[in-house]
């Protein structure tokens, strides 16, 4: 691997942790993003980046014509997804406004090679929508729940499923939502036992946590 002169990459992360280094694109130039993706793809066979702004994507794609950019998730893929697991991971989002964060989680899981199913717009304002899908959600090995506003949905789901639940607060909401802080605090104070919470808008973090939970549970199986 020829390493870019602006970054010190970690090509051994795939062997060490089970997933490769993923490029955070938001604060990088198009050339830096392209260089890093190209180098990681040379080392691992493929590469993936998150938070690539839509207005910068054409510049990156001009440098990497074989790459694929997804507008909803703001992710970019160079090469083919990995093949790592067959367990189903569910991504449940409260509202359509939460879609960018849920899409980031879904796209990241897809790159990592996991089976993933997204259940969109089934928040607590119309709780019957969740009840209509709950049996499908219960078939998942891990459930990622994405919600803004008051952040109630993860607590509700956490009381209805036996799988681990990862809560993702989003910055969606009006004034006193404080750009996701209200949802974050609500999730951290959930009465649903065992709920775990990642940072505001961090669909990527949830997508990395879910497979690590699965890998540990598989190690402990007889």
Can you name each region flagged by the protein language model?
Residues 33, 98-103, 127, 147-157, ...:
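Short glycine/serine/threonine-rich phosphate/pyrophosphate-binding segments
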Residues 132-170:
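Glycine-rich phosphate-binding loop
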């Amino acid at each position: 691997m020829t390493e870019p002169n602006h970054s010190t990459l970690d090509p051994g992360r795939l062997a060490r942790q089970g997933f490769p280094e993923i490029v955070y694109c938001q604060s990088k130039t198009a050339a830096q993003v392209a260089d890093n993706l190209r180098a990681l793809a040379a080392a691992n066979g493929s590469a993936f980046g998150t938070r690539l702004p839509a207005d910068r994507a054409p510049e990156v794609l001009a440098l990497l014509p074989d790459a694929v950019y997804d507008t909803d998730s703001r992710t970019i893929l160079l090469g083919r997804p990995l093949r790592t697991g067959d367990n189903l991971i569910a991504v449940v989002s409260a509202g359509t406004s939460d879609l960018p964060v849920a899409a980031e989680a879904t796209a990241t899981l897809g790159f990592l090679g996991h089976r993933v199913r997204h259940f969109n717009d089934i928040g607590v304002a119309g709780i019957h929508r969740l009840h209509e899908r709950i049996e499908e959600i219960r078939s998942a090995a891990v459930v990622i729940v994405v919600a803004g506003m008051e952040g109630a949905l993860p607590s509700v789901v956490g009381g209805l499923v036996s799988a681990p639940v990862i809560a993702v607060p989003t910055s969606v909401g009006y004034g006193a939502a404080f750009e996701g802080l209200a949802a974050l605090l609500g999730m951290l104070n959930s009465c649903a036992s065992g709920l775990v919470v990642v940072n505001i808008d961090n669909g990527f973090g949830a997508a990395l946590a879910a497979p690590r939970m699965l890998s540990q549970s598989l190690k402990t199986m007889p």
